[in-house]
Amino acid sequence: MGRPRTARVFMNVRVTTMDAELEFAIQQSTTGKQLFDQVVKTIGLREVWFFGLQYTDSKGDLTWIKLYKKVMSQDVQKGDPLQFKFRAKFYPEDVAEELIQDITLRLFYLQVKNAILSDEIYCPPETSVLLASYAVQARHGDYNKTTHVPGFLVNDRLLPQRVIDQHKMSKDEWENSITTWWQEHRGMLREDAMMEYLKIAQDLEMYGVNYFEIRNKKGTELWLGVDALGLNIYEKDDRLTPKIGFPWSEIRNISFNDRKFIIKPIDKKAPDFVFFAPRVRINKRILALCMGNHELYMRRRKPDTIDVQQMKAQAREEKNAKQQEREKLQLALAARERAEKKQQEYEDRLRTMQEEMERSQANLIEAQEMIRRLEDQLKQLQFAKDELEARQNELQVMIKRLEESKNMEVAERQKLEDEIRAKQEEVQKIQEEVSVKDTETKRLQEEVEEARRKQNEAAAALLAATTTPNHHHVDEEEEDNEEELTNGAENGTSRDYSKDFDTDEHIKDPVEERRTLAERNERLHDQLKALKQDLALSRDDTMETANDKIHRENVRQGRDKYKTLREIRKGNTKRRVDQFENM
């Protein structure tokens, strides 16, 4: 009988990215690189050089997995499944120049945003609000007052708790402030909003810096900051303002022996830069980060590899396709907005026409009533005139009889005279009535003339209200304009104890010409200034932190991230090493 085949032993692994959880089953022989490759293949990431797998070791410290060692032989905290985090280990010097894929952009954006919200990266209040507006654009797209009603952002984590605690503002007030700036980003793609977020965030002093507790030869407790631009030394109580800096271009070798860490400058006249870490494992981490950052620093200053060139070409194609799709969408949105605007115009005009018709109808009725009253008055006047004429005729007959009857008896004559007087009084009374009615009729005739004028105006207004003028027809030129718009339309390896670095004395320190985005962009500068003024009205100074005070003093003295880096890199290497020893 043959020997039974040994069953393969698999371990369950859970890898948490910034926006997903992945589960794998690995063998005892699986290396860190094999697991890493499986992760990046699953999520479609090609810019692998920025990232690593992080785990909590048996002592509770966060550690980066070693790519060329078996996963099971590393000090991973036991559990089922084994827990790992997929995180950015190295940061680009300039996100706009280096990040190629959308997935890379998204992972960096989510990691940096989380670091800002948890206060791992200090961010001043006004910048926090502006960044929040880009975060909302990245998540929700364009602001829409119909969909994004008050309270819409209540469950979104948008600001560091420190910023909220420092200002006497309600949730609604915070939302209003963020929404005001959110509306400024209308038409911006979600990926562009993430990029704008990172372009602002990379100017923050603590962005992309890994801090390590160290001591100099005097035993002074300090911080060592390792980032994409070099090494910086910070005083223990200030991680915002480095005091001494060494760019990667000045360093030719890094090594450590036990807890002693040695950095050899290119300038052979300069003494070694020596510091001490509390534990050997810290020195291993420092060395690994220095190696990776230095390699990327040098790689940026060489021509792109074929792989990177292909990635950039593909990214450009995808961006162009997305841009064309965006333009189509914007055209469709613009057409919809125009249609909605015209619909509103027609509704407003229809309402105006209705009101004009009602007013005209009322004027017409009033004019008709006036004419009817005049006609009645004219009839009464004519009746009075006819009656007056009849009485006058009767009076003439009576007078004639009086003149002809000279032989009439006295009594009879007296009676006739009395009748004549009575008739004269009656005629006089009727004449007065006719005179009054005549005056009233003239007044009414004037009113009728006015009424007829109003009637004509009302009829003309009624006709105008029911007729659409030519300028309300759709302009075909709009479609021509739309047609024109449519047509216009790189894994790091690590070695223990010592590492010689590639050097190039001709490399110019990138910090020399670097400026913050706010310094280069007047609009951003004005936005931050306006936000700072608005927030100052509700600020609670009693809640100010040590970092707030340091930041305020730096601003007062006109310092920013790159001005400080330029300042602390001045002078020769020996002077800066001596300065470090004397801290």
From Swiss-Prot:
Subcellular location, principal: other
Recorded topology in the membrane: Peripheral membrane protein
Alphabetized Gene3D superfamilies for the sequence: 1.20.5.450, 1.20.80.10, 6.10.360.10, Phosphatidylinositol 3-kinase Catalytic Subunit, Chain A, domain 1, Pleckstrin-homology domain (PH domain)/Phosphotyrosine-binding domain (PTB)
Acidic residues bias locations: 476-485
Biased composition (Basic and acidic residues): 496-518
Disordered, as annotated region: 466-518, 539-558
Compartment annotation: Cell junction, Adherens junction; Cell projection, Microvillus; Cell projection, Rhabdomere; Cell membrane
GO annotation, biological process: animal organ morphogenesis; establishment or maintenance of epithelial cell apical/basal polarity; neuron differentiation
GO molecular function: actin binding
Transmembrane region(s): none
Positions of the FERM domain: 11-301
Assigned keywords, A-Z: Actin-binding, Cell junction, Cell membrane, Cell projection, Cytoplasm, Cytoskeleton, Membrane, Phosphoprotein
Source superkingdom: Eukaryota
GO cellular component terms given for this protein: adherens junction; cytoplasm; cytoskeleton; microvillus; plasma membrane; rhabdomere
InterPro entries membership: Band_41_domain (IPR019749), ERM (IPR011174), ERM_C_dom (IPR011259), ERM_FERM_C (IPR041789), ERM_helical (IPR046810), Ez/rad/moesin-like (IPR000798), FERM/acyl-CoA-bd_prot_sf (IPR014352), FERM_2 (IPR035963)
Keyword Cell membrane: yes
Modified residues (Phosphothreonine): T564
Pfam families from the UniProt entry: ERM_C, ERM_helical, FERM_C, FERM_M, FERM_N
Stated role: Involved in connections of major cytoskeletal structures to the plasma membrane.
Subunit structure: Interacts with cytoskeletal actin.
UniProt protein name: Moesin/ezrin/radixin homolog 1
Organism: Aedes aegypti
Gene: Moe
